[in-house]
Regions:
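Conserved SAM/AdoMet-binding glycine-rich loop
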Residues: 38-39, 43, 112, 295-402, ...
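Canonical Radical SAM [4Fe-4S] cluster-binding loop centered on the CxxxCxxC motif
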Residues: 50, 251-287, 591-608
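Short secondary-structure boundary/capping segments
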Residues: 53, 85, 121, 155-160, ...
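Glycine-rich beta-alpha loop elements in corrinoid/cobalamin-binding modules
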Residues: 73-221, 455-503, 511-524
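Flexible glycine/acidic-rich beta-alpha junction loops that bind and position SAM and/or redox cofactors
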Residues: 76-77, 152, 207-211, 316-317, ...
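Radical SAM enzyme core and accessory elements
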Residues: 1-26, 30-32, 36-38, 480-608
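N-terminal pre-triad scaffold of radical SAM enzymes
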Residues: 36-42, 60, 246-273, 297, ...
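N-terminal [4Fe-4S]-dependent radical SAM core
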Residues: 7-37, 44-45, 203, 209-258, ...
């Protein structure tokens, strides 16, 4: 692309668009039957930090009949330059226009990237609306955590992959390949062919009806042979670690090597979508992790490695693993990161064991400011445990800690919000009696967003006015104590709640907001709530209907036809437990909670 060479010197971070990175895979286009572009709807340095996309990239490229290439959302200046030069959106590996691919697969991990999906399709010269595509257009598919409520994006995506993609994506590519050879063409026929694969959901094959109050009445298949429920795919064993990941030319958000030590979490925090949709827990062995570390560090040159999971300190042999790592890499100046830790002294001891030299900062998430509210969300930490944990961290040499809280959790009162301030003050008072100048405590607050497939999916989000009032309580209280507070813009949390719990009506609002200029909504400097407010008004949509309305346990939810494997009965039971402040124990270490997965997955631990 000669035109590309002409515009790259004029845009920010041109290395976002050059490709050719170490460990990138360039296959012979003509020697493969199926070509997929793996698309991430945000900039390069964020998408390159996504482990899931890296796993799929390498799995597909191991297949001799298929190739996978990468594409990310160009930044605003690059989009403008591409449109001016009539350069269509292209893949990094071959620089081919996306229109040349058989399939474009989007990873949807955050609702505020939805308008970027539309921008990427438009830049590629592909009709944004699935209803306007024909046989000459690539198949547009999407997966990721947001696909567990696919309805708001149903007008734009031909096919959703529900659940974990490692197996189902290869099945889909094989099925697509067979169709091309045996049938040839016919978009509807192709989709009907692919819809037979478990975990595949084609929104155009379902009729959604609504009640007079705009709630969903039903979602039913249009054709025989189409399943009434789309079931989440789960893999029994984690696929091998990617030990030759693509090495970016520029710094990325998580610029380090990564190994997923385990997948899934059963601690049962009632607000947590990931804790439901990534169940059950599946672990790698210590031997597998250590062997992969050797290869990964050798193939990348990184001197920092993250051991990733939803709760790293719950890995069954975490002490043995850390001991083995310390023994094996002693003196190698290797930094180990444990990004998801329980708030207890054991986690501090783990960090102490892997941290050599200067200690920087620890991060924990108490989530709520009172013991009562933590019981409601099933995060059963006492104030005493939190204070003792931070005191232990201070004694072990840490001078800085960041604490994450949510405001607007179900049943939260002003007293609970003030409890965040009191808890922070108690921490500071307890620690200031120790050495030196005390512990630097940073508080981060964000508004609770009710998510699909969680016990709190029926709960309404508090209003933006209430969010601002509660942030003000924190600002005033923490300022007096000399502690720093950061918070998420309430309007961003509000829009996230709208899109999280939306139905098909929202597709027209997403489309209209995009036409009005909405893009990079996840970026604070680009987020324009007024654009969205106008889109909702023009489309006669009340955002409060989705974000703030409390829903009946009997209501048909827009995502009810998506089966995560966790039963609605279990979610209702957990919702009722929250109102009673009743704890539900982690089924890995106690009795089975009969969430539904015990009937489906061999890795579930069943202790009845």
């Amino acid at each position: 692309m000669t035109d590309l060479n002409g515009i790259l010197p004029r845009v920010t971070k041109p290395a976002r668009y050059t490709g050719g990175e170490w460990n990138s895979i360039v296959k012979d286009w003509e020697a493969t039957d199926i070509r997929i572009a793996l698309a991430y709807p945000d900039v390069y340095e964020i998408g390159m930090s996504n482990l899931g996309l890296s796993i799929l990239y390498h799995l597909v490229n191991k297949e001799p009949y298929a190739l996978a290439e990468r594409v990310y959302t160009p930044w605003i200046d690059m989009q403008e330059a591409m449109r001016k030069a009539s350069i269509p959106l292209f893949s990094l590996e071959s620089k081919r226009p996306l229109r040349d691919f058989d399939i474009i697969g989007f990873s949807l991990g955050y609702e505020l990237t939805y308008t970027n999906v539309l921008s990427m399709l438009d830049l590629a010269g592909i009709p944004v609306l699935s209803s306007e595509r024909d046989d000459s257009d690539p198949l547009i598919i999407a997966g990721g955590s947001c696909a567990l409520n696919p309805e708001p994006m149903s007008d734009f995506i031909d096919l959703f992959v529900i659940g974990e993609g490692e197996e189902v994506l290869l099945e889909l590519l094989n099925s697509f390949r067979s169709f091309k050879k045996e049938v040839g063409s016919g978009r509807t026929e192709l989709l009907r062919h692919l819809a037979q694969i478990p975990g595949v959901y084609v929104p155009a094959f379902y009729d959604v009806s609504y009640n007079d109050d705009n709630t969903v009445a039903s979602c039913t298949p249009k054709f025989t042979g189409i399943p009434s429920m789309a079931a989440r795919r789960m893999i029994a064993e984690l696929t091998p670690v990617v030990t030759s990941p693509v090495i970016p030319y520029i710094a990325t958000v998580h610029d380090r090597a990564m190994i997923e030590t385990q997948r899934g979490c059963t601690r049962g925090c009632r607000f947590c979508n990931a804790g439901i949709v990534y169940r059950p827990v599946r672990e790698r062995t210590c031997a597998e992790i250590l062997e992969a570390m050797d290869e990964l560090l050798k193939n990348t040159g990184y001197n920092e490695l993250s051991l990733l999971s939803l709760s790293t300190s719950d890995y069954s042999d975490i002490e043995g693993l850390i001991k083995a790592i310390n023994l094996k890499y002693r003196g190698d100046n290797l930094k180990i990161s444990l990004p998801s830790l329980r708030l207890d002294s054991f986690s501090v001891a783990l960090m102490d064991a892997i941290t050599a030299g200067k200690k920087t900062s620890l991060t924990f998430a108490p989530e709520a400011g009172s013991e009562r509210l933590r019981r409601v969300i099933n995060k059963n930490l006492t104030d005493d445990v939190i204070i003792k944990t931070l005191a232990t961290a201070y004694e072990h040499g840490w001078n800085s800690v960041k604490l994450y809280f949510m405001i607007g959790l179900p049943t939260e009162t002003e007293e609970d919000v003030e409890g965040i301030v009191r808890l922070a003050q108690q921490m500071k008072a307890a620690i200031s009696r120790g050495r030196g100048g005390g512990l630097n405590i940073k508080i981060s607050a964000s508004a609770f967003v009710p998510k699909p497939h969680t016990p709190f999916q029926w709960v309404g989000q508090i209003s933006q006015e209430e969010m601002n009032e509660r942030v003000d309580i924190l600002r005033r209280g923490l300022k007096k104590s000399g502690m720093r507070l950061t918070w998420q813009e309430p309007r961003i949390s509000h829009l996230e709640a709208v899109l999280s719990r939306g139905d098909r009506h929202l597709s027209k609002a997403i489309y209209h907001a995009w036409k009005l200029g909405a893009k990079f909504d996840a970026w604070r400097e680009e987020f324009k709530y007024d654009t969205w407010a106008r889109a909702f008004e023009d489309c006669s949509i009340a955002p409060s209907f989705y974000a703030n309305r409390k829903r009946s346990l009997a209501e048909v939810l827009p995502w009810n036809h998506i089966d995560t494997g966790v039963s609605s009965e279990f979610l209702k039971q957990e919702y009722n437990n929250s109102t009673k402040e009743t704890a539900t124990e982690d089924c890995r270490f106690g009795r089975c909670n009969s969430c539904g997965l015990e009937l489906l997955h061999s890795k579930c631990r069943l202790l009845l």
